[in-house]
């Protein structure tokens, strides 16, 4: 990226263009009449001088006045006393999101009492004050005047009184600016101060100076700058480049994975398909481009060259392309490597890795993701677009009271707690210390009586709701109510029913067209299971559990003994550290290698995975698929075999993965075909909730519609298409807070159970449901959400279904919106296109047109448009030009309102916190004609002729033109009724690409035809007059200059360079002369190096006219003695055709030759010594010793071969001061040979020894360094995550203390491994938190080799969960002497906290530090410190601390004096307080 350039530099590159097109101005300032975007108040240690308290962000005395354009001002009403001051600006009475640099306070000094004015700009977050800055008065603000005024819509030529191009100082740095869209053309301008010529500045900042020229080569946005101190004037316009400048313009780079022009096809691709990837750069800005990609399955990184395919229609950008195809399912991670001379840039994904538009950096960046899935991957048709209902069986409905009390014990010999009141809240041991708690304090042992018969009894209710799939939480025998701790996989839990109950439920559900998915828990079992039997409850069965066998000293005595790894001390791995959930062990990294376990679950004829889909051989009484618990914590190959097993019973049966993040690696086609889409849930909540909220699983932060779209599109592009249309799109589950409570309502919480809270929450839920039911996937309803059930975190989220107490209005709404989905196939399998994503409104379209849905299935044509609005009521104009034709009529299935597409848009009325589901009316023709397949183009001088065949049902044709294949099309003609078209609006010398569409009588437009290229051009008549190069002395600073001329009638016979003419010099080494024979050994011969005799082509530059000809020149430096050959060539049509320089006859192509002879220096350099490279993954690092020479070393050439004897190919040249090189263009496992050749200034060469290297996958030593808060208890720091040997264990991976506040650990991990982690101090109660005390997302890295098989990660912990507040001083039980009458309390807490000391509130500084002086009485002083969140209540962030400080009593002879002094102090305090 580039800083502003001096005007002189800009003028040196100005090009003159004649075509001028109109453009509207774009000024990046708000109108003077705009409204304040926020409340801004200036706070600091001066506020007390204004009768306020210092650093008071709640002050109403220092609120700044909004002046428009983002500017605020505040002037102190009285003079501030002389002295030093600090201040900041806070927004909306909060430190959060402040408009200030967060790195420190701003300061000013007053030598004498003075009034001070503070300035703040909301748009740039800039702040200053009148002690250091004086703005130009409003009536004297600088403005642009000149011929540019009418071009940018800013008044008349050279009239300052009409100029609206007012420049403003947005950053308070005395640089005023104005931004506008400027059309292509030649302009002159100056800057005046105010609306007259009284004070004006021109070229070089000279007052009354010459006009400033500006020649703009293409329509572009330009910012004009004026420095009020130096009076210099400049712009940020960069003219077109003509060659390497060792810079890359970062702002012009672009790759957008959501735009099919840059990545086609969109989204995940099938094996064998080809994906086209493109990147944009400023035209002629980069010399080469490569794509570097990592294959997650093969564990290799490969670099592939890209090729320039053309430029944008306006000539501003160029495009590079690569096509990739993969024959195996995998996940690809890629970024771009771009070079221009000595500059290298990297272009990767954005910081959030959401796809879409990426980001350029100086170093390797985050990768874009591309999923490649098995072409045979599919899901059952009934899955795609069905509506799921999740049931927690114990809490849904009690259909059989006879089984309500069949359990004697829960876990071990713990009691069972049976509820007698269906409407009671679940027992929550978190509340055991609260008044009124009636539970037994034991987790998950309370039951309400819900059972399988209860579900069967309510199938008609579910059917009326529109449900077609039921997902049941675990139903197998278990000691707990959640049943994720399985006791016996072969039995239905006795409180739920038995096998016959199960079969009847399956049969009845299937009879009503409802499928059933079971919950499978195969990562762990219960410690109270028949398989583990920790408590010896099953000794009388005759089969030993693994734990009992271990107690007898021989774990093999149990048929389940090898399922678990029990250590000699009796400990074992429990899921996430819970000893109630012993984990199934892995052998060689997989549970499948535990044969008895694999046989039991997968391989046996009646293995668990198959049996429950086909109990006793009857598929109709079996379930239809599995939801699989903690899927990413079980080895992938276990799931591959699981898939193979269930496919023998029900092919493609659902395998729904529980995965809270990107699950693409599990969705490649060999196992899972759906996922619990928590990513969808979190995005929808963030958008609709519109405030920060910690729901216990994730911290939600407000986003707008554009960010919502980006996050949803990132899911769309990562998941295989059949999976995306079958994802479990949930809003809540048994693991999350109830969605109504997330949206603000909890019936059991007096702070959240008002009618207003409920009304708002219900509105939010309805809005979410509209989106959910209109979006592709399998929307899932968590039981009771549709009936108004609320609930907090587990276990409160598992309340009973409120039968008889339902919110019937909400139920009715859900039935309506679900059945709208069910009645419209387009909402199930129609395609998806974002139509509007701006601010509070999000709209997307669904289509089944031309009689086919997304998967090629035949359905009637239908179109839907779904709109949701979280803001105020409004009309939304939605652009439909690329989505559906004019005239199509729609009806809102929710409101009944009707709409029609007109002039390429549809205007939808949407209420506040409301939505619409527009469905096209039936009976409309939405089938377009077939696309044209035989379009042809013939290029001419100033024209292109197009032709094609007649298309059935077409009444007219539209013509589209671009400059590159695959996109950027502009419609250049419509309603063409012939099957030919001549385009005369072309510029000779440019490449054009055409496509044509067919349009029927209703306006339905076909897809684009086949693409054709055309090259209109002036024909070149002749090229020649190439000079003869004489005998040439070799040397690095001695180039050869070649001149030649070209003639093209109508092009070169005009003054100046012929537009779009390309000239190139070609040269090659021949090496068959006597001179070569004599000098070859010294100059040219490097053993194993094959001297290339191919042509090298370099661009030539126009140097002037020669009569009717244009003359060009190019240079090159010969680097070997002997004979060289050269020739020039010319093209007037982008290199599509070439004309070579002719001989004397003017007809025959003529290449000329010359001889290169040695210089006086014939002594070779000393040989560099190339060290043996170490083994690294995806790279080879070469190091060598420097060479010496009698004159000078020029550089080193690096050569590479796949054979020890060659041929060696030169891959790079480095300068004389560089003694290393990293080759990343390698493939792990391949063998490479290298040598380095020292080259002196006369091209004498000496080769090094040859080394052999084989890059391979080897472990990377990853060092994690973390800086922690200075108040952290000295109890150690751990790093917990999905590390292979310590999965999310906060007590493992103990770090080493490296400094007072730093810890470090080095772990060995495989390259390409994606690690998620957090820092903790031995337990999850002491895990890291964000700066506001909020839950933070998992940290994420991908292990890469940063060099020498190492990687370094540097992190900072903001806060800890267990330390919401810390007191630095004083310590508890501090004793001070009698003379100390007050003490300063210094502490640290989270941002935004409310802190009170002895019930007196104040606001801490932005960085969390606070200080407060507290008066001390004689004797023991009790200081009470309290902190709590300023917003939502959060028990973790609320804490009370009591400190005692004892002030000694004075000696007896001092008592009277001190008592008198204390009384005086108290009297003065009361006096000042009264004042």
Swiss-Prot record:
Q: Which cofactors does the annotated protein need, by name?
A: Ca(2+)
Biological process according to GO: carbohydrate metabolic process
Q: What class of enzyme is it?
A: hydrolase
What is catalysed by this protein? Endohydrolysis of (1->4)-alpha-D-glucosidic linkages in polysaccharides containing three or more (1->4)-alpha-linked D-glucose units; Hydrolysis of (1->6)-alpha-D-glucosidic linkages in pullulan, amylopectin and glycogen, and in the alpha- and beta-limit dextrins of amylopectin and glycogen
Against Pfam families, the record matches this protein to:
Alpha-amylase (PF00128), Alpha-amylase_N (PF02903), CBM_20 (PF00686), X25_BaPul_like (PF22058)
Binding locations of Ca(2+) 2: 398, 400, 403-404, 449, 451
Catalytic site positions: 629 (nucleophile), 658 (proton donor)
CBM20 domain boundaries: 1255-1362
EC assignment: the record states 3.2.1.1, 3.2.1.41
Asked whether the keyword Calcium is assigned, the reply is: yes
Q: The organism sits in which domain of life? A: Bacteria
Site feature Transition state stabilizer, where: 735
Q: Indicate whether Heme appears among the record's keywords.
A: no
Q: Entry's InterPro entries?
A: A-amylase_C, Carb-bd-like_fold, CBM20, FN3_dom, FN3_sf, Glyco_hydro_13_cat_dom, Glyco_hydro_13_lg-like_dom, Glyco_hydro_b
Q: Which family does it belong to?
A: Belongs to the glycosyl hydrolase 13 family.
User: Per UniProt, where does substrate bind?
Assistant: 524, 627, 734-735, 794, 798
Alphabetic keyword roster: Calcium, Carbohydrate metabolism, Glycosidase, Hydrolase, Metal-binding, Repeat, Signal
Q: Fibronectin type-III domain: which residues?
A: 928-1019, 1164-1257
Q: What is this protein called?
A: Amylopullulanase
Q: Give an example GO molecular function.
A: metal ion binding
